[in-house]
Amino acid sequence: VQPIGADPRKVTRDMTEVYGVGAFLAAGCQIYKMAVDTEADYIKIWPDKKTMQGNPLSGWVIYANENVSDDFWKKYDHIYVPEKGTTVKISDYARTLYIRTHWSTFNPAEGVYGWDTDEKLKKVIQGALDRGMRLSFRVIVDSRDRKNEATPAYVFDAGAKYYTDNGKRSPYPDDPIFQEKYAKFIEAFAQKYNNPDLVEFIDGYGLGKWGEAHTMKYIDPKNRETVFNWIIDLYLNCLLYTSDAADE
C-alpha cells in the first residue's frame, strides 16, 4: 500500500502506514496491521457486515405516499425479524423515506400545497424527520393505473390537453399550458424542499405512467426530445439536489 501518485522509490515505511491505514478506515473496514521483519507492512482487512454506514445515495429506502395507514410508523418501529428472534426499528436500517405520489396531492388547487394542508402527507413526512430519516420524492402526473387523477383539475380547467384512460385524465407533456402550470408548481416545491439537510434526492423527471419515461404519450412524438430537455432543465434550475436519471 502506498500513497496514490507517489514515487515508489521515495515512499517511506511511515508514509505507507499512515496512508494505508487511513484509506481503509475511510472505507469503513475493520483493520488488522501485522508488522514483519521487512521494509513492507502488510494489512489484513475484514469487511464490516453489520454497521450501517449511511452513505449518500446508497442503502435502503422506505416507499410511501399520503395514503399510508394510521399505524404506518408504529409497524415500522416494531418489525419482527425471525433470524434475530426480536423486533427491529426500520429507521435504524433505512435512512430515507421515498414519497412517490401525485402532483394533485402536492398541489390540489392553484396556489395550495399539500405540505401545508394535507394532514396525512404532513404526518408521514414528520414521522420520518422525527426518526432522523431523510426525504426523497417523485411527483407523478400520469393517471393511468391510478385510483385518482394524478394531475390537479385546475390544470385541465385552464385548457391543458389530455387523454383519458379508464375515465381518468392525463396531460400531454408537450402541451404549453401543462408546462406553464407544472413549472409554477416545481418552483414552489423547490422553495419548500430544496434543502440538503432534509432531502436525500428528488427525481428530476416524473412524467409517464408510474413516472417512467418509456411509457410517454405526446401530442406530437417529434416533441420527445424537446420535452425531455424542458423538464430536466426545469428541475436542474429549481432544484440543486436532484436525481436526474429517467427510465428512457
Where in this protein do the model-derived segments appear?
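Conserved small/polar residues in nucleotide/adenosyl-binding loops
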Residues: 241-248
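The substrate-binding groove and active-site-proximal loops of carbohydrate-active enzymes
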Residues: 103-116, 167-180, 217-222
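Boundary/entry segment of secreted carbohydrate-active catalytic domains
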Residues: 41-95, 100
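CBM-like carbohydrate-recognition segments
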Residues: 1-40
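Short, low-complexity, polybasic intrinsically disordered segments
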Residues: 214-239
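An active-site-proximal structural segment forming one wall of the substrate-binding cleft
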Residues: 124-129, 167-201, 227, 231-234
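A solvent-exposed, charged loop/short amphipathic helix patch at secondary-structure junctions
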Residues: 155-172
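Aromatic-lined substrate-binding rim segments of carbohydrate-active enzymes
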Residues: 91-94, 98-158
